[in-house]
Amino acid sequence: MTQANNAVYTDLSVDDLVKEALQRGEGVLADTGALVVETGHRTGRSPVDRFIVEEPSTQDAIAWGPINRKFPADKFDALWARVEAFNNAQEHFVSHVHVGSAEDHYLAVKMTTQTAWQNLFGRCLFINPAKYNPAGRDEWQVLNVANFECVPERDGTNSDGCVILNFAQKKVLIAGMRYAGEMKKAMFSVQNFLLPASDVLPMHCAANIGEAGDVTLFFGLSGTGKTTLSADESRYLIGDDEHGWGEGVVFNIEGGCYAKCIDLSEKNEPVIWKAIKHGAVLENVVIDDAKHADYTNVSLTQNSRAAYPLEHVAKRSEKNLGGEPNAVIFLTCDLTGVLPPVSILSEEQAAYHFLSGYTALVGSTEMGSGGGIKSTFSTCFGAPFFPRPAGEYAELLIKRIRGFGSKVYLVNTGWTGGGYGVGKRFNIPTTRGVIAAIQSGALIGAETEHLDTINLDVPLAVPGVETGLLNPRNTWADKAAYDEAAKALAGLFIENFKKFEVSDAIKAAGPKL
């Protein structure tokens, strides 16, 4: 443990970070030993407060708009100086971490936080290398000062908080944000911009490896099942959220997991349950007087979270990477009950559904989305985190799928037998059965039937899954109502896809009216 005269705590151990957080009243310990914290009125990401500095080296490569908002370079310099001075006047914490597990693609990051618990969070989620920055690369700086209050009129921000990326200066400024997920997603966005230049596809996905070395990717928005389904006791976890796919390799961008905790149970999610122990952080989880976590209590938020290092997962890839994927799974939470539990996709269909990113917003992962559930299209299954034009990522995906011969599947973790409020959601064991069949190779070359309106091919049988569930129309009591719902969903797909300039073959791979 080192402490400089200016009260900078540098590269503390996990034990010491927990101790400092407790001494400062930043959180309390749960009965499992995990540190429990609350993040105030922001319990999810704030997309309207995220900016990218407009500067010559990147301005022509970024898809500017409501997601990637421009921020003036001079305003950034002034605000960084102001926040840094505020932070330097008090005790703070510094850790040196990597973002990206592949030797050729890591970023060396100096992470400075005002709070001990956010530094612990960063140590959970980022990579703690045996040797820091062995290649001697230029260092990125993350400055995360939770108690600084931005003044929009003075600082050029949207509110009292901000997340600003500066590629030219290799800086990420996070001010006024207690929700720690902002730090993780900011560095993901950085890698999402940088990796394509090295012919690496960055992906919002989970990944795991079977005993035979076969790799599966799970794409999907928050709440669709990436973390839960990839945490499989029969397989080795690479990671639950952020990966890069290059020639010959899938590598984790992170060194930990950030699991949604709502309704978490030891029975359905044993890997996650066991990982929540000393060194982990529980964010906005309610605990009782006995310090026992109540994962069913959503009084703080539906977006309660657990952050833990991969070392807390018994079966994991020791190198934090694997080979190229045999199976690529797009997870979608379909509110309408129209999509089947599993469809087998062609290359063109893979591109179509990757660009569409159809799913539901489940819970309040983003501030302002409310606690309910609504359908959405999120390009690349993670639109908020991809700075380049979507077509660049889609082209890289097709290149990688074609080059390795990966099989691609669309898996619905949402509703069956009717839409939200009428039907019911697929239970986790059913979806795990679908995943197991995919990973066993049972669906390769399987006999299928074609569903015309949604233009998908559905296997006639899936080992371990009830056959009556496979064609969604058969699960509806009112077949005419299903047909109408299918047409309505097809219309949403078609309308959303108008913004993409792609080949006719890809356009033809989507739903039809």
Swiss-Prot record:
Gene Ontology BP terms: gluconeogenesis
UniProt-listed Pfam families: PEPCK_ATP
Catalyzed reactions: oxaloacetate + ATP = phosphoenolpyruvate + ADP + CO2
Record flagged with keyword Cytoplasm: yes
Localisation per UniProt entry: Cytoplasm
Note describing how the cofactor binds: Binds 1 Mn(2+) ion per subunit.
Binding site for Mn(2+): K185, H204, D241
Annotated positions binding substrate: R45, Y179, K185, R305
Main location class: cytoplasm
Enzyme class: lyase
Pathway(s) per entry: Carbohydrate biosynthesis; gluconeogenesis
EC number: 4.1.1.49
Keyword Nucleotide-binding assigned: yes
GO cellular component, one term: cytosol
Positions annotated to bind ATP: K185, H204, G220, L221, S222, G223, T224, G225, K226, T227, T228, E269, R305, T431
Named cofactor requirement(s): Mn(2+)
Swiss-Prot/TrEMBL keywords: ATP-binding, Cytoplasm, Decarboxylase, Gluconeogenesis, Lyase, Manganese, Metal-binding, Nucleotide-binding
InterPro entries membership: PEP_carboxykinase_ATP, PEP_carboxykinase_C, PEP_carboxykinase_N, PEPCK_ATP_CS
Quaternary structure note: Monomer.
PANTHER family: PHOSPHOENOLPYRUVATE CARBOXYKINASE (ATP) (PTHR30031:SF0), PHOSPHOENOLPYRUVATE CARBOXYKINASE ATP (PTHR30031)
Function: Involved in the gluconeogenesis. Catalyzes the conversion of oxaloacetate (OAA) to phosphoenolpyruvate (PEP) through direct phosphoryl transfer between the nucleoside triphosphate and OAA.
Name of the protein in its database record: Phosphoenolpyruvate carboxykinase (ATP)
Species name: Pseudomonas fluorescens (strain SBW25)
